[in-house]
Amino acid sequence: QVVNRIDVLYESLALKQKPPFDEMVYRLGEDTKALDTKVAPLKSLARAFEKTAMTKENRFDSDRLLDLVRGMLVFQTMEGVAAALEALGNSKDRGWTVVRMKNRMRKPTGGGWADVLLNLTKNDDNQHFICELQLVHKKMLVTREDLRGHDAYDDFRTAAEFLELVQEKAEAG
């Protein structure tokens, strides 16, 4: 995305793109028979600042905040995930373009989370504001929600980011 001011990202872009993104996610969930469709509130400003502070390069640059607007489709089977990916292959027809994909099924995060993460932009947005969509197998959510694994993961992620920052400063002298 081309905007690097967090206030503009929130006030002008995130608030503008959230309604059409949410609509697209719900429609995609219906079309692909997702088990569950989740759209999140805007990422908190505190977490957004935390993310920009913890980046190694270009600290506090907000142009890398790609998940202020986000959603999730949950599928019973991997075939469902594949159906959503196929439908998103034609996302330009839905008014959106996939600009990045991370297959974290193949390589899970350090905390063990596995999904397919997609970044999309609305075709008519000349600011190229990026939204995030996660395609998730239902079994991943058992750990995250039913066993309260996400709270533990949040704590782990924040601690790991902080330790990485401290190590970086120590190595820099």
Regions found by a protein language model. Name each.
Residues 1-65, 82, 157-167, 171-173:
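Charge-rich, low-complexity segments
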